[in-house]
Amino acid sequence: MASKKREVQLQSVVNSQNLWDEMLLNKGLTVIDVYQAWCGPCKAVQALFRKLKNELNEDELLHFVVAEADSIVTLQPFRDKCEPVFLFSLNGKIIAKIQGANAPLINRKVIALIDEEKKIAAGEMARPQYVEIPLVDSLDEEYGEVHYESNVEVYNMAVINPDAVLMRKNLEIKEKITKEGFIIEIQENMLLPEEVAREFYNHMIDEPDFEEFVYSMTNRLSCVLIISQGEDTEVIEEEALPQSDDEEEPDPLEEPHVRFAPMLVKKKRDSLQEYMDRQHMSDYCHVEDDAVKVSKFIDILFPDFKTMKSTNVQRTLGLLYPEVCEEEKDNVLDIIQNEGFTILMQRQVVLSEEEARAVCHVHEDEDYFDNLIGYMCSNNSYILVLMREHSVERWKELIGPKTVEEAYASHPDSLCVRFASGNFPVNQFYGSSSKAAAETEIEHFFPPQSTLALIKPHVSHKERMEILKAIRDARFELTQMKEMHLTPEHASKVYFKITGKDFYKNVLDVLSSGMSVVMILTKWNAVGEWRRMMGPVDPEEAKLLSPNSLRARYGIDVLRNAVHGASNMSEAATAISNVFTESNFEN
């Protein structure tokens, strides 16, 4: 009887719609065992629930309930099912479901959600936007008996480990993920913060080398991916067609012949983890699919991501025709910034004939087209990468229609009208036609470039982290990174241009004093941008001429000037090839 009493105290009984509605008023987490009247609640997990209740000791935050599907209208989809179902209600919202008595999974889910609630209550984190799931049985979903749409995007997070990044396996893994139809929403090579590494790999906590593993993940470069499921694939299946009444009866001794008709159906894609397992990529990449945990990791690692997704922040390519570029560029740039655009990249360029034809293709049927192309190919245009919410549409709206005549009639306040030219009756501005077109055009006009960068041994760990943050803030992609002791042999692969100089021995003395961080940094004009960030070679001169540069902030003298970078693209390519080769991976 004592055991029976403990079970009643452990799990409240909900056997009517009114009691269900009252239960949803619970604060915190309520774990609901959905059961059938004929078989009763799942006894296999009651010991786990008791253990969680005792160990977590959070009576105000953690509640356990048994709910009879037969008596509750809301639970109708779960009636007459044999497999146990556990629902997780967080402050009245059903956010997760587990099919079957999967005790380890239930345990992880409860602990993670309670930990979230504690941190929220303590003001240590903002409440994530929890996903409310529809109450649909998994079999119904599989066979299409119930259909629903969710406007809430659910993400997985994948971390490709440092060894795989160093061997460039991350490129292969990303290609396979996208070819399967998954969408990589954001990707970045980074050092994992310790709190993220410990929680993300919490399943390994009992491994004897866990602390060593955490150190590796927080001091070596991993590739972090935030991935959405993408659309389910459409496949053609064949459906049997009934024979018509007037067809001859088949010979009973013959094999029956059934006619099939093609039918387009949606095939549910495997989960990301299942796909990774099937492709034998799990040794290189770990996946987290718990929506609550992924939401938390996104808040820590990519704090702007949710805002950018919800407001549809995007990039577009803008172009100023030569006459505007020469005479009105500064005025136009002021207008662009006043309209809320951020100018990410900009350059002056003379278009090739192919580029000019692509930009001016809307005028190709006009008599003046050839003259326009000649004009575009003989003078400087100004190209920009612009960012804001709905950037593609907003920029096209700002610049107006393709001709001055149309603009006067429908968009008199557009840039087309304000900066109309007498040479050609066309809009003196260009914008990408779509988000996809924008990304293609941006990569064409602002192709990524890589340079070799080095943080010298005298820079402290704290300062090193600050430099890495500055690199990230400057929108460099940290393509590769490794910590190296630059012996004379290794140093000559980086400083090959000065090995014959008198001062080279002094350089070797500085480099041999400790560990350096060697990196490949990638972005458009990477060589020039990194040299600008570094500042003048002498830190004292840097403090006068470029006080915010890295050498001004972290340099001590000419030799210990904090950072180093290639002087030009040729030097960068040679140094990268020297340092980041397969023979050096084990350094």
Curated annotation (Swiss-Prot):
Domain Thioredoxin: from-to ranges: 2-119
PANTHER family for the chain: NME/NM23 FAMILY MEMBER 8, THIOREDOXIN DOMAIN-CONTAINING PROTEIN 3
Chief place of localization: cytoplasm
SUPFAM superfamilies: Nucleoside diphosphate kinase, NDK, Thioredoxin-like
The UniProt record lists the keyword DNA damage: no
GO cellular component term, pick one: nucleus
The protein, known as: Thioredoxin domain-containing protein 3
Miscellaneous comment in the UniProt entry for this protein: In vasectomized rats, autoantibodies against Txndc3 are present.
Gene3D superfamilies: Glutaredoxin (3.40.30.10), Nucleoside diphosphate kinase-like domain (3.30.70.141)
Keyword Repeat in annotation: yes
The gene coding this protein: Nme8
Subcellular location: Cytoplasm
Listed EC numbers: 3.1.-.-
Record PROSITE patterns: NDPK_LIKE, THIOREDOXIN_1, THIOREDOXIN_2
Tissue occurrence: Testis-specific.
Single Gene Ontology BP annotation: flagellated sperm motility
Domain notes: Contains 3 inactive NDK domains that do not possess all residues considered to be crucial for the NDPK activity.
Cysteines engaged in disulfide bonds, as pairs: 39-42
Family: In the C-terminal section; belongs to the NDK family.
